[in-house]
């Protein structure tokens, strides 16, 4: 059995880790970094870039550079948060045929799981390069407050990337695993406050020693899947746009290139202001009007940034309060506070959290890597490499069905430990009703329409009977990934209907299979592209070396030699400009053969010169050696 890797699939950055010889190793990518930007770009020459290379070219290619796609995963196009996102990003968010939010690049519609799969493929390749063997299994993390559709979509992304997703694990739970595995024995309760690039989670977790096992039990979880560092960036970008407009009268919002430069500058300034009190945002030639080029130069203080985002930080406190209440605990019951996610490096966030919980957060947990480390530990638990860990997670939202009058009737309450199974008997609403529709919902509202619809299915052929007589048993079964399976059974006939909840939206099995095939085809295309690039480089190098040899040969090269070589050189240069690898290799061989006689002639002459070196020169060389020895002053060494 191969290694099970742990992947933190983040909104802004992703990270991959593996348990090796009892220690977790965060694996560096091809660029030498331990985290990879979750950015994908499609270039004009048909190449797909992932990570840092994609981020580097974003300024010149904003419409085809996709970032923060995780915020769209498992979401419907008409959701308010999606409509808000459309205003914020330079790329195109469109409505798919099934009503989901997809993206459109170069006229092609793509599902968010398909885009996220590109990041997962990069993580998979990073691990394979390090391990030197294929990797097919992974544990992938999701925000604790992700609903069923979002979890299912993340699992789909893994499949498209060629990974068997052994477990979907909640990010705060993974961070607690990373923190708690090597801590002293004894029970303690921790808060994991996870403010990442696009999502916010808070979990109350009890870490206990039970019969020699580390038991991690999630008591409650809460959050906001559309609140994160991206929103902090947007506040700063809006401020910079307003300041520039006041000064120059120009609104940069209509200029995608300028906005992309501003986005990068705002992100950099935000990071700098975590360690300095003031920074300059300086963008020369950001735009131009009739009077000439315009430069943006704005001083931003830490206090100014804090005033811009204070309400966002405060928005994280209510979920903390709710999670504590759901767990039946007070602030005084919390032993440790763990901060996860890059945005928690902001001093205002740290201060606000410390004030609410009455204690400073721990500083020994790496906020960028803890989640991937925890995922790797969970992977090792599933592989049987780690024996003494038990993870008890919860479902973040209440699950139920729509009943008479458009009411949501809960079957499994939020914060129920998973896996779990619950059955309840319902009946018909009308006399002689022959079928019932089971409408599965997720959320906390009493009105069914206010909750997230996860799917519908019918139980038909119910024998005629007065309303209220038939007994229909509805069973909800949540697996360890937090993914729901629902069945309905007519107790009189034993007839049963069941589904794995595929969101009323979501990708069909056929779509996933097609995307898997596309990904495999792209991998083959990428391999061919790499081989072609390598052949071109070799061809260029051979052209350069051959021209250098002709120059050095001077008169030793006959006109006939030169003509033969020049002809072969011209053919190779033409081949290098084309797309045929076999042609390039053939022309390289031809050039090698054409230049071999001249190379042999030059080599023979050089060897002859070495043998014919005058005796006087050799004697002089010997004299030089003696002089050097004579001049050496050993006492002063």
Swiss-Prot record:
The modification Phosphothreonine is found at residue 199. Residues 603-637 are annotated as: Disordered. Induction: By stress conditions e.g. heat shock. It holds the Pfam family HSP70. Keywords: ATP-binding, Chaperone, Nucleotide-binding, Phosphoprotein, Stress response. One of its GO terms (cellular component) is cytosol. GO terms for biological process: bacterial-type flagellum-dependent swimming motility; biological process involved in interaction with host; chaperone cofactor-dependent protein refolding; protein refolding; protein secretion by the type III secretion system; type IV pilus-dependent motility. GO terms for molecular function: ATP binding; ATP hydrolysis activity; ATP-dependent protein folding chaperone; heat shock protein binding; protein folding chaperone; unfolded protein binding. The keyword Lyase does not apply. The keyword NAD does not apply. HAMAP family: DnaK (MF_00332). Acts as a chaperone. Belongs to the heat shock protein 70 family. This is Chaperone protein DnaK.
